Amino acid sequence: DGAVKYAFLNLLATTFLLIAIALLYGMTGTLSMADLAGKVAALPDDAPIETIALLFLLSLGMKAALFPLHFWLPAAYHTPIPAVSAIFAALLTKVGVYSLIRVFMLVFPDSVEIARDVMVWVAVATMIVGALGALAETDIRRVISFTVVSGVGVMIGGLAIGSEAALLGSTFYIIHSIIVSAALFMAAGMIARAGGGTRIADLAGLYKGSPFLAVAFLLCGLSLAGVPPLAGFWPKVYLVQAGLEAGAFGVVAGILVSGFLTLMLIGRIFALVFWRSAPEGSPAAASDGGAMMKGALGALTVLTFVVGAYAAPVSSLSGRAAAELLAPGPYIAVVLGRSEQAATRAPEVRP
């Protein structure tokens, strides 16, 4: 079921993406993003740029798991082995989000203004639906899958606002989400080993046998909710400040509500899976995994704390990325300059 949904939705998204690319190429004669930045802005007013921009939003939004086309992600991410799920959660949706940010800030900067209302409500709906879906699930791996969906909404919220502070927050959140999503899926795999399954109702008392796993899961979950001083706190602060300054109160409300729901969710899972006593006569917990898995989870958990406690380097890096997104002139000049040099150096073809 998960494979069918994943394959169908991604095939459909790729089809829409190719249509958008073909239309854009037909009007501009180029696919270089640096070249497109100038040529799209020079197109006449009657050119269907808004339609093409919405096609990009639809296709890349499907790949990023934006609401209402997010349902493939929880169906697909909980089925592979934990290591594969961790890689999927860390990278795949982030590629879609990164592509949306690059395309809309470089090729369609004016369309960001036009599509702002659509992006705002899609982002808010993705945050809330993801968090509510996680609360409603009974399988811990599906729960974490829905938190990935909610995080995608937070990232797109920064694009919808469009300011430098908002893009800084989105970039920082991408880095945070890569770390935490991978860690939580690895923790879910270790929980399945220790407890013999991933159904929350069947799990109990794992703290006694796996205190390291319990602490790592709790810290990564709190980071996901945006609790200081962990890594998830700072990007949400930047996004909330940017939303208040821009009057994007829907995005601010979505971030705060989804964060509160995530905090409730992590507290419920920790209480049921780790803290409550196992029923009398239940088998003892098995090993929660090998040294490599524990080492990887420990490293990601420490990284989550370090990035939160010493956020200045990541904030600086994210800030530079945001500034370049809003002022892409140097990037365009470098790319087009290299293209012109390559063209002049190309050997002449003689008959």
Predicted regions and their residues:
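Hydrophobic transmembrane alpha-helices and their helix-loop junctions in integral membrane proteins
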Residues: 1-228, 234-237, 241-263, 267
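Alpha-helical transmembrane segments and their membrane-interface junctions
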Residues: 29, 221-239, 302-324
